[in-house]
Amino acid sequence: MALSVEEKAQIVAEYQQAAGDTGSPEVQVALLTANINKLQGHFKANEKDHHSRRGLIRMVNQRRKLLDYLKGKDTTRYSALIGRLGLRR
């Protein structure tokens, strides 16, 4: 249940720091958050899909690592990002 090309492009355009920026922590966290939210809906209908659940846990861990990195580098960008995404960290 991956994001479509249009959804990815919209998220990248919304969170990029400069034109063509796809690697900044903000963009990566926003893409992971969108994937995680999409998978949560999948698990409501498919409770026994343990293989995909492993992928979900991996995405959550990767997002946590990126957020920890951003918090250490620039706390104002970190605070702004979790506010925009509605995360509860």
Swiss-Prot record:
GO terms for molecular function: rRNA binding; structural constituent of ribosome. GO terms for cellular component: cytosolic small ribosomal subunit. PROSITE patterns: RIBOSOMAL_S15 (PS00362). NCBIfam families: S15_bact (TIGR00952). Keywords: Ribonucleoprotein, Ribosomal protein, RNA-binding, rRNA-binding. Coiled coil: none annotated. SUPFAM superfamilies: S15/NS1 RNA-binding domain. One of the primary rRNA binding proteins, it binds directly to 16S rRNA where it helps nucleate assembly of the platform of the 30S subunit by binding and bridging several RNA helices of the 16S rRNA. Forms an intersubunit bridge (bridge B4) with the 23S rRNA of the 50S subunit in the ribosome. One of its GO terms (biological process) is translation. Belongs to the universal ribosomal protein uS15 family. The keyword Transport does not apply. Part of the 30S ribosomal subunit. Forms a bridge to the 50S subunit in the 70S ribosome, contacting the 23S rRNA. This is Small ribosomal subunit protein uS15.
